[in-house]
Amino acid sequence: MSRALAPRIVVVRRPTEYELLIQQHGTRSQAAFYLERQGQKIDEIEERHRRIERALDAVRREIPLAWRNVGLLRSELDRFVFEEKDIIVAVGQDGLVANVAKYLQGQSVIGVNPDPTTYEGVLVPHEPAAVADLLADCAAGRASTESRTMVEVVLDDGQRLLALNEIFFGHRSHQSARYRIAVASGEERQSSSGVIVSTGTGATGWARSINQERNGILPLPTPEEPTIAFFVREAFPGSGFGTKTTYGLLRTQEELRIISEMSVGGVIFGDGIEEDSVEFLWGSTATVLASKTRLELVRAAQGSRR
């Protein structure tokens, strides 16, 4: 009779500013010299690095010795094969959780804030000392989670893009984006600064700013609501272009279609990560909807010791 595998914990982090400086300049003294020439000091950057390192060490100590664990950098996410029952511990800023979310299929994510003086902690609300209890809750199936909606884009060539906050359609440069946009009420040809499609998680950022500029024209969704919002930025009312379909809500199973009319420079990217962009050139069709894949973000379980 085979024994069940111990739970596997995947600890995800991104390089610190200090690590990137050392990588770029080779040594601490060379990095310090470079910063001093820019009128800056390395001390504060180094102290932030130490705080994050202390948090990572504390998290590792919270993992039971008999459990499996893997350390992962953000840059390695696209090459890593997650297991169905992995428990992910994201140690870093809120954006790290968004980076991780698009590679998951319902695994639990524990967000740990290594530096509350620097990071807001909306998606990383836990301190390192809470991790042992949270891991036990997850392994026992009693953890309380927020099931956050994600936005999904499927291209007609089969490519798929997921994002936790928002997805941008537009031109790589500052040129206008040209495309046709289609919703249930009809289709319209547009020239604009691009289209933003946001979840409830992303509704506190870019979408909120656009919505405020338009006097709160849409009731933005909450993070767990299976609804996404779209906004067209600066639609141009020129000959052959329309400006009627510039905002809206897409509820469960409702779709938005965008057909590119850009010969060069058309792109789609999620959560502000332009290096992960997908080309969106003339004739390509993108279908956007609230994804069936959701982020399972762990909160404290009722009756726990936290």
Task: Show which residues each predicted segment covers.
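Short hydrophobic segments within beta-strands
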Residues: 12-14, 198
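A short, basic/flexible loop-to-alpha-helix module at the beginning of a structural domain
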Residues: 74-82
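Short glycine/serine/threonine-rich phosphate/pyrophosphate-binding segments
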Residues: 96-101, 203-208
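N-terminal glycine-rich "phosphate-gripper" loop used for MgATP/nucleotide binding
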Residues: 90-94
